[in-house]
Regions:
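Catalytic glutamate of the conserved HExxH
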Residues: 186, 190, 194
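N-terminal, motif-rich segments that launch catalysis or mediate targeting to/interaction with membranes
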Residues: 1-182, 197-304
Length: 304
């Protein structure tokens, strides 16, 4: 679904066959690669992380390259998260992005009970990092521990990772030359997830307020009532809320994700710095109550 939304953001106006699927490339290929990154970031595992798994530790792990390994790790993370284990620095990134401290990559809280203001701050930090990366402020060799953004420091400051290791581990030189587009695609993924009911609970937009930054403006989406956390959700129900049918139900609303995404593409093309464009992001992820606790929403998993 992310590919279709992204192609529509890049002004694909056709039907599903035109705007979705592997052959739909209205958006730049590296942007689409970045959109996929949040769900399937490439990574390698230390010996203590891969014990007992069917993973080739010397090779980059992605769903496409090591599907059995990937699925085994995902199910292990799922079982442990259901027992209220938490994942963070020192754990494999797959555990962290779906069940741990990096759930903000999907516009979600890292745990039930996390205050909306905390999740919002993490998401805004990621938007800042990925926007600045998309504008060429960092290079492949920039070490994440040297990026002075609190969410990046908290997530990756313990490591020697570079942007190369984060975004393009195991990739060829072609994708690495398009680092800026990869980063922008990752930003769009988080934006798109902030419209999915399994990720957030938003008010309906009235269409009367606008998000503005310089010459860029669009109708403001509804404010966020609650961020959800994935740990105790029913995955099938979550998946239904991520479906094309769910997207199309909100596609005509003012401030929808395609309208907002197009505004961000225009802002990037205009060369807007983070300091100039940040009001747009603050508007898009505005929250109703700063202390609203995260939870599974209407997607609670049944008790085992």
């Amino acid at each position: 679904m992310h590919e279709e939304i992204t192609n529509r953001i890049y002004r694909c106006e056709g039907d599903r066959e035109v705007c979705a699927g592997d052959r739909a490339t209205t958006a730049p290929a590296a942007v689409l690669a970045g959109v996929r990154w949040n769900d399937d970031p490439p990574f390698r595992m230390a010996a203590n992380q891969s014990s007992g798994s069917r993973c080739k530790r010397s090779e980059t792990i992605r769903f496409e390259t090591q599907p059995i390994c990937w699925a085994t790790l995902f199910e292990d993370a799922n079982r442990r998260a259901a027992r209220n284990e938490s994942f963070g620095a020192g754990d494999a990134i797959l555990y962290r992005t779906h069940f741990g401290d990096l759930q903000f990559l999907h516009a979600m809280a890292s745990r039930d009970g996390e205050a909306a203001s905390e999740t919002q701050a993490k998401l805004m930090g990621w938007f800042e990092f990925s926007w600045r990366a998309s504008m060429g402020e960092f290079t492949l060799d920039t070490r994440l521990k040297d990026v002075q953004i609190p969410v990046v420091q908290a997530a990756f400051g313990h490591s020697e990772w570079r942007l190369l290791d984060l975004y393009t581990q195991g990739a060829g030189g072609g994708l690495r030359r398009e680092l800026k587009d990869v980063a922008f695609g990752s930003l769009l993924h988080a934006l798109e997830d902030s419209y999915a009911a399994g990720h957030v609970d938003r008010e309906e937009s009235s269409g009367t307020s606008r998000c503005l930054a310089g010459s860029i403006g669009f109708a403001a989406p509804g404010v966020i009532r609650e961020f959800h956390a994935y740990n105790h959700q029913d995955h099938s129900l979550h998946g239904e809320a991520d479906s094309r049918e769910a997207f199309m139900r909100r596609f005509q609303e003012p401030g929808n994700v395609v309208e907002v995404g197009r505004g961000l593409v225009d802002a990037r093309n205009a060369g807007m710095k983070w300091e100039e464009v940040s009001p747009l992001f603050s508007c898009v992820v505005a929250i109703q109550r700063s202390d609203a606790p995260a939870g599974p929403g209407d997607f609670t998993a049944a008790a085992p």
